[in-house]
Amino acid sequence: MTICQFFLQGRCRFGDRCWNEHPGARGAGGARQPPPQQQPPSGNNRRGWNASSQRYSNVIQPSSFPKSTPWGGSRDQDKPPFGSFDSGASTSRGFGSSQNPFASPLSDEQKDEKKLLEGIVKDVEVWESSGQWMFSVYSPVRKKPNISGFTDISPEELRLEYHNFLTSNNLQSYLNSVQQLVSQWRNRINELKNLTMSTKGALLSDVKDGVSQAVPAFGFGSKQAGSFGSPGFPVNNSSSSTVQNFSFKTSPGLATPPSGSTSVFGSHPAFGAGPSAGSSISSSTPAFGLGKPEATSAASFSFKSPEASSFASPGFSGFPASMAASPSGSTTAPPLRSGSSVVGFGSPSPHSQAVFAKPSTDVFGGSGISTSVLASGAADNALFTPRDQLMKEELEQFQSQRFTLGKIPLKPPPVELLTV
């Protein structure tokens, strides 16, 4: 064992409790044995260094340190759990148990429910004061069922139903229905802002367990998508037969006007409805090529040299010419015909007529009667400008690879300068 250098110098403060060896002293070896009985030193050995008369034998002991220190104390010291601080009647350490040990604290589930209800109240207050769209659904928790009492109607659906009611000259029923929806929405908002015990229980049940959306509150109908004509929409069923058509149900056409009448736009809906008398749209199959196409094949899509090439030639556009000759005289934008290809390069329907040009050979082959993309209200009906009608500066701009800022021609280019 290592000899204590401080003992040799007479400065060891631990005496027999030293970990190092004290030569000549009883209990040497650093075993930290209990201190021997102190005896008064003899006259001849007052300044000696032995076990009975050590100068620093009763110095600071390790066990004499207090258990709790300002620096945190020892590791085995009793510490109260976090959150048990009692500001009213604290113990000597400043931490203690609650004043009422028999009071049962709120569980985590109850805290979550309280926080959820507070969030719902705050959301509906913001919804009401911000002026957001009323006819929408609301769920306070992600991927949870919507709270009952609200209906989902888009502005486009309301606009469509307005036109349907306008056609049937029954706008008063439309206004009454919308006003009733608004009043029901406000009543539901007020219920959520002023929650009662029964309302809280039903609300938590809706959010947690989920409710059957078959019979939502306020009679909005049995379907998730509310409809003005369905039993859920607040409309008097005996008012008119056209009110029953005020619905948002999915159909092959975007909507179907009342029987025996013409749609607001002079025809059936553009997206896939069937033809009717007085229709300004000559589409007989669903738009964008979803129906059975006409006899248009890839053989007509060729790069044969044109005889009188122009963009007004057949097949360049899939729009029928009836857009410029509707019964009302107005210009409407019909859908793409399914008889043409996606880009419109193909043989058009034989029922369409040319708007800008007489029948000629198609740019990419195939002949027939042309259809046009734009209406005939433009000042310049020609899609191309002959060379002799162009100024020198304009012709230079068309022949250059890039236009110069401020010198871009306002006329169409000559057909000779177009490359495919």
From Swiss-Prot:
GO biological process: mRNA transport; nucleocytoplasmic transport; protein transport
Region Disordered, annotated ranges: 25-111, 323-345
Keywords associated with the record: Glycoprotein, Membrane, Metal-binding, mRNA transport, Nuclear pore complex, Nucleus, Protein transport, Repeat, Translocation, Transport, Zinc, Zinc-finger
Compartments, record wording: Nucleus, Nuclear pore complex; Nucleus membrane
Region (Interaction with GLE1): 365-420
A GO-annotated cellular component: photoreceptor outer segment
FG repeat feature ranges: 14-15, 82-83, 95-96, 218-219, 220-221, 228-229, 265-266, 271-272, 288-289, 345-346, 364-365
Zinc finger (C3H1-type) boundaries: 1-25
Primary localization: nucleus
Feature: compositional bias, Polar residues: 42-67, 87-102
Taxonomic superkingdom: Eukaryota
Claim: Oxidoreductase is one of the keywords in the record: no
Subunit structure: Probable component of the nuclear pore complex (NPC). Interacts with nuclear export protein NXF1. Interacts with GLE1. Able to form a heterotrimer with NUP155 and GLE1 in vitro. Interacts with XPO1.
Record note on domains: The FG repeats are interaction sites for karyopherins (importins, exportins) and form probably an affinity gradient, guiding the transport proteins unidirectionally with their cargo through the NPC.
Protein name: Nucleoporin NUP42
Originating species: Mus musculus
Lineage per the UniProt record: Eukaryota, Metazoa, Chordata, Craniata, Vertebrata
Name of the gene this protein is made from: Nup42
